[in-house]
Regions:
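Short, compositionally stereotyped local motifs that mark structural "simplifiers"
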Residues: 103-192
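Flexible, acidic glycine-rich loops studded with aromatic residues
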Residues: 1-132, 138
Length: 192
């Protein structure tokens, strides 16, 4: 009998998007992919799955040491909420449904914030069409944007511009934050 830790789902030092810090040799994945873990998709037979006692996650310290180890921000950002999805997988049985899990996960934001955990929020959705830039979030986070490196300001609605590359959006809620993203054609993120 064994405990499993497939890297493409549970190595929390892996990048969460192509433009964020972290390793990428096992996979690039966020909380949604962690939650989507399935034994059959990973090549386990039913007989092999029957011998699994549980799942576990890992964060390899060489990456942490390269990011100011005096503060937990980077470790928190890389680990949470992926660790929440891992816990759900390890302790809950039955059919998993992302929308329901994400609804419950958002309830944990206040708890993680109260504990001082610097968790990662899902990135804002940004689009640019016909000279109009829009951004949205799926939670109660505050959406902000700096224009070309200026002080961030609250996003209150669509922005008319011919220069979408000057706008990057980030959401924050308590001690959580999202990566900073732009319109897909100009997409990039900053380091956490």
């Amino acid at each position: 009998r064994t405990v499993v830790m497939p890297g493409q789902y549970f190595y929390f030092d892996m990048r969460q998007s192509p433009h964020e810090d972290g390793h990428d040799w096992a996979a690039i994945f966020d909380v949604r992919k962690t939650y989507s873990f399935d034994f059959a998709r990973c090549g386990f037979t039913p007989a092999q799955e029957a011998n699994v006692l549980g799942v576990e996650g890992a964060f390899f310290s060489e990456l942490y040491v390269s990011h100011n180890p005096e503060t937990p921000d980077y470790l928190d950002y890389m680990t949470f909420p992926r660790a929440c999805a891992l816990a759900e997988l390890g302790w809950s049985e039955g059919v998993r449904e992302w929308t329901e899990f994400y609804r419950r996960l958002r309830l944990h934001y206040d708890r993680m914030g109260a504990q001082g955990i610097h968790f990662r929020l899902m990135p804002p959705r940004v689009s640019y069409k016909d000279g109009v830039l829009t951004a949205a979030v799926d939670d109660d986070s505050q959406l902000t944007f700096p224009v070309d490196g200026a002080q961030p300001q609250p996003y209150t609605g669509p922005i008319r511009t011919e220069r979408p590359e000057l706008y990057l959006f980030r959401s924050s809620y308590r001690s959580g934050r999202s990566p900073e993203v732009g319109a897909p054609a100009y997409y990039r993120t900053l380091k956490p």
